[in-house]
Amino acid sequence: MSEPKGRGAAWTEERGTSDKGPPPQAARQARRRLESGPAASGKGSAPEASELLALPGAVEASWPDEGVAAHYGDPMREQRAAEQSAAIVDRSNRGVLRITGQDRLSWLHSLTTQHLEGLAAGQAAQALILSPTGHVEHHLTLADDGTAVWVHVEPGTAAALAEFLESMRFMLRVEVADVSQDYSVLTVLGPAGDDLAAGLDAVAARVSPGPFGSIDLIVARDLLPEVAGDLLRRGAAAAGMWAFEALRIAARVPRLGLDTDHRTIPHEVGWIETAVHLNKGCYRGQETVARVHNLGHPPRRLVFLHLDGSADRLPAHGDPVELAGDDPGDEHRAAVGFTGSAARHYELGPIGLALVKRTVPVDATLLAGGVAAAQEVVVPPDAGGGVQVTLRRRQFL
């Protein structure tokens, strides 16, 4: 996980403000300061800075989570609150799509890897959009509210997804709207999260459970400070993306664009279990999914890394993974994979996820960006080939 930009804003009781929700004036000032920085120069497409960066101690995150908080002063305490009680995580940098029309579920069913026909109102699902050759292009977290399907996706990917969906509408009764500028994602974590999030009137949609037990609230962007403040007053702690990422990694949950690359197929990272329905009809990329599941094995597999705690750094995203037994003086050592995500966990210490070749021995010690790492199997080497496997994942909640 990359270092934050070190830019934050706080407000105090001296200004007549509460410590349980960001005052609109301070939030607007924080936003103006953020927008006047390098991201406002027109280079790149950095997301709009969240108003919750006005919370006390907020430090803005860097790629891939610009625009929201990395932490609020104590990432370890934030993780503990998220696992033991309740915490809210500002994920308003994510893209949000709203899909309406009578054919919305059957249409999405035909385009994605998931069985979405008859999806009950309020029921959450994960789905993938694959390339014609079966490589993962989009990971969708979604729910239908009875009148529309709400989808949230990785930062910066909503426009491309909306463009693809528009190209596949044909004569069907569906409408696709990229509402990322108008709606945001606020995630609630922890065993007390359900009770705290109950009865929130200002929530447009609720996507629950999320990929690792989270409650993802879709909130109108101008109401985000109000909803966050309400949850803080109810007893939730504010947690940043450092805490969220550490808990995600500990739960062995991959993230598109970090733990995947352009060649990733669903089997390699375990999405065959959570985002793919193996008995549904035809969709783009299905031939690859069926062939690997029934006849072969994925060429790579996701592993969980216990990183050397004596190292003073974490491996960076994309750092090569090598076998620790190879000659350290050999400049031409072959990489056996790449590092995806890495973070410091409040109990487990430095941890990470990596994608390695299937043939790497499961008991081999690895080097991730030069940092020694013991591996735990997430996706077994015998995945596919008609073998029914259970992913080795840590229960989060």
Positions of PLM-derived features:
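Anionic-ligand-binding alpha/beta catalytic cores of soluble enzymes and soluble regulatory domains
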Residues: 218-306
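Short glycine-/aliphatic-rich beta-strand segments at the starts of folded cytosolic domains
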Residues: 88-110, 175-191, 297-308
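Short amphipathic beta-strand starts and helix->beta connectors
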Residues: 75-84, 125-139, 169-172, 197-205, ...
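Short, intrinsically disordered, mixed-charge
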Residues: 109-117, 163-171, 229, 233, ...
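Acidic, low-complexity central loop/insert segments
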Residues: 96, 138-254
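Acidic, proline/glycine-enriched N-terminal capping motif
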Residues: 1-126, 130, 135-137
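Glycine-rich, small/acidic residue-mixed loop/short-helix segments
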Residues: 2-3, 8-12, 19-23, 272-276, ...
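Glycine-centered loop/turn motifs
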Residues: 121-124, 203, 252, 257, ...
